[in-house]
């Protein structure tokens, strides 16, 4: 009988925001507007950087890569979420769920390390301005971007393999897309080893880049404190303010959603953090 149950699970259904069924239309409109603004904003950033030759610098190159990565990242999540408001029981195949998880994890980790690369770029621009152009050559920039993406691919392969080799007995995913932990909960067997593997991966992809960014800003601050002119302070603040804001929001939400014990997080909180 158990074998029969294992072979029957070929697709999943998302629980999504079914708890808020009375507000489906409102949520659909709100998230559609936010999604449109996000995609449009990233498209504008990439277009301006591409057209304006004055912006063909390492800092804006990394920014354009982050914008493109975030755009593709949302394509794997938000349309699925929006469709769940319209068709509440829309299923996804096991293969489709695997594919969605792989690309979601790849791009999420890629974003983490791209932010780290941007922190390194700011460090070099402020702390080593004379050597900045030499060290951050076009070749080095491409290698850093490829390195971030490669780490994302490798970590995604580990996580997806550890999850989708499990036998599944349940079909309702407690999320609006195929995230690692909600899918793992559908397994029929003990997943302790898989949970340990994925927790170690999460620690690596969140704490390591966050730590590197922290070190970069400690070095930046120590350099800025030596600057006597107000103009130098303004230039440094203008360079780092946007990146630091994104870093705080990104790593803050990621840490709460993926590092805190699940007993301390409500389902609604996890859903909203995932959207962020």
UniProtKB/Swiss-Prot annotation:
For this UniProt record, the keywords arranged alphabetically read as follows: Cell membrane, Disulfide bond, G-protein coupled receptor, Glycoprotein, Membrane, Olfaction, Receptor, Sensory transduction, Transducer, Transmembrane, Transmembrane helix
Q: What is its main location?
A: membrane
Transmembrane region(s)? 26-46, 55-75, 100-120, 140-160, 197-216, 237-257, 271-276
Alphabetized InterPro entries for the sequence: GPCR_Rhodpsn, GPCR_Rhodpsn_7TM, Olfact_rcpt
- Membrane topology classification: Multi-pass membrane protein
- Give me the Extracellular side stretches, as residue ranges: 1-25, 76-99, 161-196, 258-270
One Pfam family of this protein, by short name? 7tm_4
A Gene Ontology molecular function term for this protein is: G protein-coupled receptor activity
Task: Establish whether keyword Cell membrane is in the entry.
Answer: yes
Q: Which residues lie on this side of the membrane: Cytoplasmic?
A: 47-54, 121-139, 217-236
| Superkingdom in the source lineage | Eukaryota
Keyword field contains Disulfide bond: yes
Sites where a glycan is attached = 5, 190
Where is it located? Cell membrane
Q: Supply one GO CC term from the record.
A: plasma membrane
Q: Could you provide one GO biological process annotation from this protein's UniProt record?
A: detection of chemical stimulus involved in sensory perception of smell
Q: Which cysteines are joined by disulfide bonds?
A: 97-188
Q: Which family does it belong to?
A: Belongs to the G-protein coupled receptor 1 family.
Q: What role does it play?
A: Odorant receptor.
Please give the name of this protein: Putative olfactory receptor 10J6
Q: What is the lineage of its organism?
A: Eukaryota, Metazoa, Chordata, Craniata, Vertebrata
